[in-house]
Amino acid sequence: MVFLDSVWIEGASRTGKTKRLLDRLCEQIDDREATDDGGRRDRQSGSPGLLVISATSSDRRDLRDRLGARMRARGAYPTYAIDTTTPLGFFRREVLLFWPLLVKTLHLSAHFPLHVRPETEQELATALWRRALDEGKLRQEHTSEYRLVRRILDLFQLAAARGLPYEDIPQLLQDGFGLDDDLPFLWESMGACLHQWRQWCLERGLLTYGLMTELYWRHLLPDPVYRDRLTRRYRAVFADDTDEYPAITRDLFEILLDAGAVGTFTYNPQGGIRSGLGADPEALQRLGDRCQYEQLKRPSGLRETFGPIALQLLDNPAIYARPAGMEFQALPFAAIQTSSRAQLLRATGEEIAAAVRQGQVKPGEIAVIAPGLDAIARYTLMDHLSSHEIPVDSLNEQRPLVSSPTIRALLTLLALVYPGLGHFLDRDSVAEMLVILSRSPENDIEIVGAPRSWPGREELPIPPASAIDLVRAGLIVDHCYAPATERPRLLPVNVFPRWDRLGYRATQAYKGIVDWIEGQRKQVEEERIDSASILLDRAIAQFIWHGSKLPHREISALRELLETARHYWDVDRRLQDYDRRQDPEYVTVGEFIKLLRQGTISAKPFPVDPPHDGEGAVTLATIFQYRSARLQHRWHFWLDIGSPLWLQGGAATLFAAPLFLRDRPRQPWSETEQLDTDEERLERILNDLLARVGDRLILCHSDLATNGQEQNGPLLSLLSGWVESDRATCKPYF
């Protein structure tokens, strides 16, 4: 059945789909205000609101801000609810709101639901499956224990996103991968472990993302009581970028449409950024058959002219493809070609610096995009550009929390306060802690030629100086640190025979740290500190914050540490209450330190944005990060175009993800099907990125990869087809 009031808006990248959706949303608000007599009827009856869904949280914030700007321009606001959310956020909220209904339906214990974050989920699942892992029931060739556990949990999430019962996962894997070797036994073991995991979580009221998604589509959405409440809450649904949604969202939208809600959906055939991560574009595309169809066509970037030519070059690398009548010199392309990747990174940094210095482009108009950015590449580019005073924004960079010296210092502090954690300490970590914790604005020394408080000093995100430098910290640790497994201690400074060599500031700072540790240790012994998260909060207030402006990265790390600690202790308290046990606090602290040192937890910068000047910063991102952020820049530098990762999808594809597409027949996964999938993904990537580059595309290639292997990826045909040989040098033609 086609709903005449509902609209399916289809268009390529940057053709105005979101703007059209906002237009429809504002029209709906205006029509409703007029129909309901200025909103007075809404206020009296509490009539249904509007459901607005975006693909990611960043898209949701952007859409919400744009809608708010339009409302402010109108000078009027709707008097009913406008819910802005993401698919996963919607599932989570609905499961929490209707948890009593699920408790009644599934006969669960009446625990208040507690969300479990992915890193905690990994730790709990590993502990639960320890016996199966040790006995070899869960073992896959060339796969570590950590990755295998993550794969099993991801399979549960993929099945839930498709709307597939988790009991069918072993059979689906067997149909897809065949009956070779011991794989059927492995699939059955995975299924048994997932059943055990699901029951274990439900008994304790713990909800992972996968479990919340499964509870929503399998138990909540079919429930007639919930359906009645759902359809009465929303009279219209607006979904942006539906090509990034899981298949079960189509079931949700169809229920709302059948109940009379008006729908507006946008779809990008060249999108599918989250294909391989649970999104199912083909399943959502079928929703368009039930709506009026609108197609948007608007030239954007280089796609209109060079998108079809790029696909020709992929099919036939031998041709020199360019628009008719356009000479090579007029093409908006250049190349940087070197022998080694180290040379390539340096040359790329030099060319960016030269272009900015000559005024050809601003830093905020440049994006460096790569199929995969390792830590060395990030550091090299950021260090090189920073040396030229060019700001760099590493998009969604998620470094492990433990990589921050401040976080390591706080973990060391925990090990000194709580007993039985001496095995986590060494002399270097204690010395580092002394340097970090002795920071204070009072220690800022005068800068040559400038007073201590020069104009603008208070606005700069510069951490204060340390009263204890590295040399003094080393001397203190050598003479005043008493290592011990049970109770390591920092001894009084006068234990050091030549403590006078430390100086007054260092001595006083050290004494303050020791006194604070002893005071907190006494409170721990008296059980006056409920959890280590309280101790961390006190330590940050005492030693780190000082009311000063910390660097953006350090603020993000501290906030994530506190959030992680609070979450970890909430989960631990739930488990101890359920099991009716009372573990010593130091045991939980030790497990928390071990979890952080594994490097699985990273700092997420939202909602703090790094400050830049008016010219912005050079964006550094992977393909997936850049496309997910839906950015556009005048200049693009495509790194490692000879890398096979352009074709393979890299980390943006979960294990067995194509098998979980709703419309895929259950048949063995073949190499031909894999090749077709990779080629389709590459075509989408090329069209999408070409739509996001405005004036200039620089192809960056090194003959050898980091591991010394020759690079012969599929995008090398672009280099030969678009850039003349005399321009494909280390110094590109501009």
Task: Describe each model-derived feature in a short phrase.
Residues 1-6, 41-45, 359:
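Phosphate-binding P-loop
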Residues 13-32, 300-388:
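Helicase P-loop NTPase motor core
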Residues 639-723:
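C-terminal accessory regions
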